[in-house]
């Protein structure tokens, strides 16, 4: 030992200086870590802060795992088939102990955090929400007087101490009855404080966040896990009691053989598999009747009553591999807990009867708790659906009472169905109204800004003006074949299409029979007359009349900007009156586009008529007839003979052309005479309303200033 000490000392003296602690101390990463840990060490934590809230969720999961872990110690004793002996599964014990140490570490961290977590003073709860006590000494005193004892009892590694230190040094009884009784007692004693730690933790989570589970399905799964936990505990207790029942039978039969004239005599040490290769035990096994008298499969033998524990031996549960053994015990606990223990065949033993009564009562309590909580969580997911069904039933009864036509009833049903599919019963306006102004503005900007920017007219505005518009947009839903705006009706809102298509048509074209129709798609808008009305600087409060009829071609989801909101924005932000926005509005307005189209068509037709008149005049100059001073026309026969020198071959063509031009000029002279008498001028006015051409007057220009 001294040589090992000298060797290690010499090796440490010869260590290179690059690995010295001084160099490690000057590491910037190390200094950063130390600064973080020092801040955490000196900081008092807020019980409602993010750190404590997240830790409570993590620790709740750790508590559930620890509650599932502790009953696994009941599966350590095993029975080797056909040998009448018991042993401990050491490998499985090491596995459980490692995870148990990790759980104990989390409980220790929880205790340390509680010494640093502030609390609300009871005297300050009279007015307001209360004040936090940040003094470390007061926090420690309060914790030591309240929950420290329970947390410490849940943290102590009692099962590890019993398995690895107490039981191996228990003398000749370390493989006998004390083994199972002591282990079971320790595990059950510490199982209680660990469960008590979880209850106030659950209440704190609900107090901090409002719910223990964030979703309905996770809440239902949480309650189902608790129910499986109880089944897990019952199954493991049933297993260890089955082992103890088998050991009790062997012990009784062994004592009988010890008192009888039986050679070799039975010894309680033979019931442990550690003496399996003992020659005395092997000789005893050849003549003993312990195995036959304690066989649960022997129906004719009435030496011992196994009662409800007989299935553990008839199905070879005690000698099966761990997973087969565990799932069978879990199924046994789940079956009897759900059936309130009705399938149990208990013996007359008082302990067995008490255990059966406990299973019955526990099944009644926990099964009712499971059904109630799962039903509450699942009802929260279908509550809005049930409300919608009630409203739909009320709507159907109202339509039947009012005797609405089938077409109207179908449209109402379609709208109710579409509104449910779009909103799922959520009142978005009520949710937004309950939020602070700044948060509501940011949410509206996130939801509407990208959609509003898709409207080319609003894309010309700055962010502040767009925020003011987005803040006042409200969702609007319309089903197929719904007339949103009718021509001649007051316009009370502008619609910005998000999804769907609408048809915008007008008959106001300056002549009878005029019709113009366009299709509005996502990114388009309608009701632009309202924008003109909002920008007019007069005191007229009457809403403008629509010049178009807007009808939905499919289900349409849009945002609506009401008249009073648009008027408020126009009055508050004078930038809406800029020439740039005026030109952008005229360019993207469908009303102005329709007017421009008709104006171009009318101008083109006037141009074609003037071109035809000029062509006719040119043909007149090239022809053989002329006009005298009185406006009469003369043919070439009335002209001097010197002008009749053309050949005979052109005479017939000239006569046909002359007849055609004569008819055209006759009609032109007649119209010229009528116009000359009415206006005192021979000029043709293509803009006169008597002309038979389509005409659409330009929309009224707003009085921009």
Curated annotation (Swiss-Prot):
Could you list this entry's UniProt keywords, alphabetically sorted: Calmodulin-binding, cAMP, cAMP-binding, Cell membrane, cGMP, cGMP-binding, Ion channel, Ion transport, Ligand-gated ion channel, Membrane, Nucleotide-binding, Transmembrane, Transmembrane helix, Transport
> Where does the record place it?
Cell membrane
Residue ranges in the Cytoplasmic topological domain are 1-57, 113-147, 202-222, 375-705
The UniProt entry, under InterPro entries, shows: cNMP-bd_dom, cNMP-bd_dom_sf, Ion_trans_dom, RmlC-like_jellyroll
Spell out which residues lie on the membrane's Extracellular side. Answer: 79-91, 169-180, 244-353
Chain residue ranges for the region called Disordered = 636-655, 672-705
**Gene Ontology cellular component terms for the protein in this record:** plasma membrane
Where does the record place the region Calmodulin-binding?
573-588
Q: What positions does the domain IQ occupy?
A: 593-622
Stated membrane topology is: Multi-pass membrane protein
Q: Which GO terms describe its molecular function?
A: calmodulin binding; cAMP binding; cGMP binding; monoatomic ion channel activity
Ranges of biased composition (kind: Low complexity): 642-655
Major localisation: membrane
Residues that span the membrane, as ranges: 58-78, 92-112, 148-168, 181-201, 223-243, 354-374
| PROSITE patterns, per the entry | CNMP_BINDING_3
Q: Which residues bind a nucleoside 3',5'-cyclic phosphate?
A: 457-580
Q: Which Gene3D superfamilies match?
A: 1.10.287.70, Helix hairpin bin, Jelly Rolls
Q: What does this protein do?
A: Putative cyclic nucleotide-gated ion channel.
PANTHER family to which the protein is assigned, alphabetical:
CYCLIC NUCLEOTIDE-GATED ION CHANNEL 15-RELATED-RELATED, CYCLIC NUCLEOTIDE-GATED ION CHANNEL 16-RELATED
Subunit field text: Homotetramer or heterotetramer.
Q: What is known of its domains?
A: The binding of calmodulin to the C-terminus might interfere with cyclic nucleotide binding and thus channel activation.
Homology family: Belongs to the cyclic nucleotide-gated cation channel (TC 1.A.1.5) family.
How is this protein named in the record?
A: Probable cyclic nucleotide-gated ion channel 16
Q: Which organism is it from?
A: Arabidopsis thaliana (Mouse-ear cress)
Q: What is the lineage of its organism?
A: Eukaryota, Viridiplantae, Streptophyta, Embryophyta, Tracheophyta
């Amino acid at each position: 030992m001294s040589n090992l000490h000298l060797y290690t000392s010499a090796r440490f003296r010869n260590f290179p200086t690059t690995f010295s602690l001084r160099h490690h101390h000057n590491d910037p990463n190390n200094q950063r870590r130390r600064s973080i840990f020092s801040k955490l060490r000196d900081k008092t934590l807020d019980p409602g802060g993010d750190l404590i809230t997240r830790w409570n969720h993590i620790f709740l999961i750790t508590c559930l795992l620890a509650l599932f872990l502790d009953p696994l110690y009941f599966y350590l004793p095993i029975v080797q088939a056909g040998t009448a002996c018991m042993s401990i599964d050491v490998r499985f014990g090491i596995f459980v102990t490692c995870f148990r140490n990790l759980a104990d570490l989390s409980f220790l961290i929880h205790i340390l955090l509680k010494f640093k977590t502030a609390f609300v003073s009871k005297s300050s709860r009279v007015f307001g929400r209360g004040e936090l006590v940040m003094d470390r000494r007061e926090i420690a005193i309060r914790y030591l007087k309240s929950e420290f004892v329970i947390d410490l009892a849940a943290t102590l590694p009692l099962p590890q101490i019993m398995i690895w230190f107490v039981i191996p040094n228990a003398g000749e009884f370390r493989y006998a009855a004390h083994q199972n009784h002591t282990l079971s007692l320790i595990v059950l004693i510490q199982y209680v404080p660990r469960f008590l730690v979880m209850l106030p933790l659950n209440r704190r989570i609900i107090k901090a966040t409002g719910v223990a589970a964030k979703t309905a399905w996770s809440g239902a799964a949480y309650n189902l896990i608790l129910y499986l936990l109880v089944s897990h505990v019952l199954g493991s207790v049933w297993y260890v009691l089955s082992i103890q029942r088998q050991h009790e039978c062997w012990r009784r039969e062994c004592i009988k053989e010890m008192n009888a004239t039986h050679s070799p005599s039975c010894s309680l040490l033979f019931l442990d598999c550690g003496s399996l290769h003992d020659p005395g035990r092997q000789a005893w096994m050849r003549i003993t009747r312990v195995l036959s008298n304690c066989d649960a499969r022997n129906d004719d033998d009435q030496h011992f009553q196994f009662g409800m524990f007989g299935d553990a031996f008839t199905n070879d549960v005690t000698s099966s591999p761990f997973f087969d053994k565990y799932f069978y015990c879990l199924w046994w606990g789940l079956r009897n807990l759900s059936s309130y223990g009705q399938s149990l065949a208990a013996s007359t033993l008082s302990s067995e009867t008490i255990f059966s009564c406990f299973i019955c009562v526990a099944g009644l309590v926990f099964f009712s708790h499971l059904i109630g909580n799962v039903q509450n969580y699942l009802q929260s997911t279908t509550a809005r659906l049930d409300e919608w069904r009630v409203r739909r039933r009320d709507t159907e009864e109202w339509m039947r009472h009012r005797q609405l036509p089938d077409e109207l009833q179908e449209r109402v049903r379609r709208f109710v169905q579409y509104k449910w599919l779009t909103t799922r019963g959520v009142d978005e306006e009520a949710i937004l109204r309950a939020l602070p102004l700044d948060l509501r503005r940011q949410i509206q900007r996130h939801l509407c800004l990208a959609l509003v920017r898709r409207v080319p007219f609003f894309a010309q505005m700055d962010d502040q003006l767009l925020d003011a518009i987005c803040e006042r947009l409200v969702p609007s839903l319309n089903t197929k074949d719904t007339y949103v705006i009718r021509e001649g009706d007051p316009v009370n809102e502008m619609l910005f299409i998000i999804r769907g298509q609408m048809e915008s048509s007008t008959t106001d074209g300056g002549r009878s029979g005029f019709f113009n129709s366009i299709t509005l798609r996502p990114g388009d808008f309608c009701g632009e007359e309202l924008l003109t009305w909002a920008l007019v600087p007069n005191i007229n409060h009457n809403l403008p009349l629509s010049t178009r009829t807007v009808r939905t071609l499919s289900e349409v989801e849009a945002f609506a900007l009401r008249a009073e909101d648009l008027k408020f924005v126009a009055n508050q932000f004078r930038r809406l009156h800029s020439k740039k926005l005026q030109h952008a509005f005229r360019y993207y307005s469908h009303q102005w586009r329709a007017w421009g189209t008709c104006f171009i068509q009318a101008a083109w037709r006037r141009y074609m008529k003037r071109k035809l008149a000029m062509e006719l005049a040119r043909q007149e100059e090239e022809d053989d007839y002329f006009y005298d001073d009185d406006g009469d026309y003369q043919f070439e026969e009335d002209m001097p003979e010197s002008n009749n020198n053309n050949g005979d071959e052109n005479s017939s063509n000239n006569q046909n052309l002359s007849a055609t031009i004569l008819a055209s000029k006759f009609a032109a002279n007649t119209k010229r005479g009528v116009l000359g008498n009415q206006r005192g001028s021979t000029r043709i006015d293509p803009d006169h309303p008597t002309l038979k051409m389509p005409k659409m007057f330009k929309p009224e220009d707003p009085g921009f200033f």
